């Protein structure tokens, strides 16, 4: 699972997901990509599940780039705990994804294989996505 090696602070504010992504919205490494169409928090488990699904589908050959990284800690309070007594402890990590952000890129495979692999990865994501081709 992806997570930062160290962070400056253990806990973060939840924040808001306004607007569209101005960074990370162009294909940089591969030829095909999966682009987000909705805002969401994507957990490190979901990112890993999508990556595994893609790599299993293409087997050998081709290359996969993961363009998002979970760098936001999500805190969870223990169940049946009374209000107060501070914020909960960090439980898992998420990547904040806005519309337009590229999630995965793929290269070195024919388009039909890439389309199939990326559609399997998109089914692992909690948001609507689209398949795009560079050029």
UniProtKB/Swiss-Prot annotation:
GO terms for biological process: mitochondrial translation. It is found in: Plastid, Chloroplast. One of its GO terms (molecular function) is structural constituent of ribosome. GO terms for cellular component: chloroplast; mitochondrial large ribosomal subunit. Keywords: Chloroplast, Plastid, Ribonucleoprotein, Ribosomal protein. Its main location: plastid. It comes from the Eukaryota. InterPro entries: Ribosomal_uL16, Ribosomal_uL16_bact-type, Ribosomal_uL16_CS, Ribosomal_uL16_dom, Ribosomal_uL16_sf. PANTHER family: 50S/60S RIBOSOMAL PROTEIN L16, LARGE RIBOSOMAL SUBUNIT PROTEIN UL16M. Belongs to the universal ribosomal protein uL16 family. Part of the 50S ribosomal subunit. This is Large ribosomal subunit protein uL16c. It comes from Glycine max. The gene is rpl16.
């Amino acid at each position: 699972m992806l997570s930062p090696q160290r962070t400056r602070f253990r806990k973060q504010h939840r924040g808001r997901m306004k607007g569209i992504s101005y960074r990370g919205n162009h294909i940089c490494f591969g030829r095909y990509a999966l682009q987000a169409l909705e805002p969401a928090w994507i957990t490190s488990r979901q990112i890993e599940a999508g990556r595994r699904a893609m790599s299993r589908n293409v087997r050998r050959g081709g290359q996969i780039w993961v363009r998002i990284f979970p760098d936001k800690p999500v805190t969870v309070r223990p169940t049946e705990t009374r209000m107060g007594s501070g914020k909960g402890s960090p439980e898992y990590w998420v990547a904040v994804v806005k519309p337009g952000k590229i999630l995965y890129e793929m290269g070195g495979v024919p388009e039909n294989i890439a389309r199939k692999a990326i559609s399997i990865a998109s089914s692992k994501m909690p948001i609507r996505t689209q398949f795009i081709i560079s050029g």
